[in-house]
Protein backbone atom coordinates (compact mmCIF):
# COMPACT_ATOMS: atom_id res chain seq x y z
CA UNK A 1 0.00 0.00 0.00
CA UNK A 2 1.37 3.42 -0.92
CA UNK A 3 1.81 6.16 1.63
CA UNK A 4 0.60 9.73 1.58
CA UNK A 5 2.01 12.92 3.04
CA UNK A 6 -0.29 15.30 4.87
CA UNK A 7 1.08 18.84 5.05
CA UNK A 8 -0.77 21.38 7.19
CA UNK A 9 -0.03 25.05 7.80
CA UNK A 10 -1.38 26.34 11.12
CA UNK A 11 -1.15 29.26 13.49
CA UNK A 12 1.54 28.96 16.16
CA UNK A 13 -1.20 29.44 18.77
CA UNK A 14 -2.52 25.90 18.20
CA UNK A 15 0.86 24.18 17.87
CA UNK A 16 0.65 22.31 21.20
CA UNK A 17 -2.96 21.28 20.51
CA UNK A 18 -1.86 19.79 17.18
CA UNK A 19 0.90 17.84 18.93
CA UNK A 20 -1.53 16.55 21.58
CA UNK A 21 -4.05 15.48 18.93
CA UNK A 22 -1.45 13.55 16.91
CA UNK A 23 0.23 11.91 19.88
CA UNK A 24 -3.16 10.56 20.96
CA UNK A 25 -3.52 8.61 17.69
CA UNK A 26 -2.18 5.05 17.90
CA UNK A 27 -1.93 4.89 14.10
CA UNK A 28 0.51 7.83 13.88
CA UNK A 29 4.06 6.62 14.49
CA UNK A 30 5.62 10.07 14.16
CA UNK A 31 5.41 13.45 12.52
CA UNK A 32 7.44 16.59 11.84
CA UNK A 33 6.61 20.08 13.02
CA UNK A 34 8.57 23.20 12.06
CA UNK A 35 8.22 26.94 12.49
CA UNK A 36 7.92 28.77 9.17
CA UNK A 37 7.36 32.32 7.95
CA UNK A 38 4.19 32.55 5.85
CA UNK A 39 3.93 35.22 3.18
CA UNK A 40 0.62 36.25 1.61
CA UNK A 41 -0.85 39.04 -0.47
CA UNK A 42 -3.81 39.06 1.95
CA UNK A 43 -2.68 41.02 4.98
CA UNK A 44 -6.14 41.78 6.37
CA UNK A 45 -5.77 39.33 9.26
CA UNK A 46 -2.15 40.20 10.07
CA UNK A 47 -1.48 42.13 13.26
CA UNK A 48 0.54 45.36 13.03
CA UNK A 49 3.90 43.64 13.65
CA UNK A 50 3.14 41.06 10.94
CA UNK A 51 2.10 43.77 8.50
CA UNK A 52 5.38 45.62 9.04
CA UNK A 53 7.44 42.42 8.72
CA UNK A 54 5.43 41.23 5.71
CA UNK A 55 4.95 37.69 7.02
CA UNK A 56 3.22 35.70 9.72
CA UNK A 57 4.92 33.12 11.94
CA UNK A 58 3.22 29.75 11.38
CA UNK A 59 3.91 26.08 11.94
CA UNK A 60 4.17 23.41 9.25
CA UNK A 61 3.07 19.91 10.13
CA UNK A 62 3.98 16.82 8.07
CA UNK A 63 2.56 13.35 8.68
CA UNK A 64 3.42 10.31 6.56
CA UNK A 65 0.43 7.95 6.65
CA UNK A 66 -1.45 5.21 4.83
CA UNK A 67 -4.58 6.16 2.86
CA UNK A 68 -6.78 4.18 5.27
CA UNK A 69 -5.58 6.45 8.13
CA UNK A 70 -6.57 9.67 6.36
CA UNK A 71 -10.11 10.08 7.77
CA UNK A 72 -9.01 9.46 11.37
CA UNK A 73 -6.10 11.85 10.99
CA UNK A 74 -8.25 14.63 9.54
CA UNK A 75 -10.93 14.15 12.23
CA UNK A 76 -8.34 14.53 14.98
CA UNK A 77 -6.98 17.71 13.42
CA UNK A 78 -10.46 19.11 12.72
CA UNK A 79 -11.24 19.05 16.44
CA UNK A 80 -8.22 21.30 17.09
CA UNK A 81 -8.84 23.67 14.19
CA UNK A 82 -12.30 24.99 15.09
CA UNK A 83 -11.00 28.34 16.39
CA UNK A 84 -8.07 28.69 14.00
CA UNK A 85 -8.47 27.49 10.40
CA UNK A 86 -5.70 25.32 9.00
CA UNK A 87 -4.72 24.91 5.35
CA UNK A 88 -3.74 21.37 4.37
CA UNK A 89 -3.03 19.17 1.39
CA UNK A 90 -2.33 15.49 0.92
CA UNK A 91 -0.01 14.13 -1.75
CA UNK A 92 0.95 10.58 -2.70
CA UNK A 93 4.49 9.48 -1.89
CA UNK A 94 5.95 7.72 -4.90
CA UNK A 95 9.17 6.62 -3.24
CA UNK A 96 10.82 6.68 0.15
CA UNK A 97 13.47 4.98 2.21
CA UNK A 98 16.58 5.64 4.28
CA UNK A 99 19.96 6.78 2.98
CA UNK A 100 23.23 5.98 4.71
CA UNK A 101 23.77 4.26 8.03
CA UNK A 102 21.76 1.36 9.34
CA UNK A 103 19.39 3.17 11.68
CA UNK A 104 16.28 4.97 10.40
CA UNK A 105 15.74 8.55 11.44
Give, region by region, the residue ranges found by the protein language model.
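Positively charged, small/polar-rich N-terminal and surface patches that mediate targeting and assembly
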Residues: 1-105
Amino acid sequence: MTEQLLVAIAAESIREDLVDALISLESVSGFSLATIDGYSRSHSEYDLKEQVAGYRRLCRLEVLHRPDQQATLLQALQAVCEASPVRYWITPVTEGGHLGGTSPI
